[in-house]
Amino acid sequence: MRLLVYGAGVTGSLFSARLHEAGHDVSLLARGERLAALRRDGVQLAQGDSPAARRVPVPVVEHPADGYDVIAVFVRAHQVDAVLEPLAGLEGDVVFLLNWAGGPEPLGAVIGPGRVLLGFPTAAGTMDGDVVRYRAANALTRRRWPTIRTRSAA
């Protein structure tokens, strides 16, 4: 299964690095200076205040493209509208992992109602230059809203 992580901030970088280290086929979408840093150094992770940072060579892309089975979106709520249009033309389910109270309907109206999943990552961290400093956590909440297809099967 091919995964695209859309958003190279703290949580997107952390999740993509962890998925890559676990052997999954994952790419990380980034732009601008963050893209250049990731191409040069990979995702750099440091737990807490540790002076040691490890480099994880997650493949990075600048633009979303077809060929991914799942796209995990790690952006802030005010950035969602900007990513919907590029996602609408792609295949694969889209998991929105952010603080989103609007429900799946406005997202599904643009990208297709059967493709939307919502979740909330329980990871904490901060950017220290190009290094992601994180606190260890192992939980992810998720919910798939029933679609016409899943309601009729129930």
Name these PLM-found stretches:
Residues 1-51:
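NAD(P)+-binding Rossmann beta1-loop-alpha1 motif at the extreme N-terminus of oxidoreductases
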Residues 5, 28-31, 73-74, 97, ...:
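Active-site-adjacent beta-strand anchor residues
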Residues 7-12, 42, 100-102, 119, ...:
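Glycine-centered flexibility sites
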Residues 37, 90, 109-115, 130-154:
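Internal alpha-helical scaffold of NAD(P)-dependent oxidoreductase catalytic cores
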Residues 46, 61, 143-144:
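Residues in well-ordered beta-strands of folded domains
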Residues 52-133:
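Rossmann-like NAD(P)(H) cofactor-binding subdomain of soluble oxidoreductases
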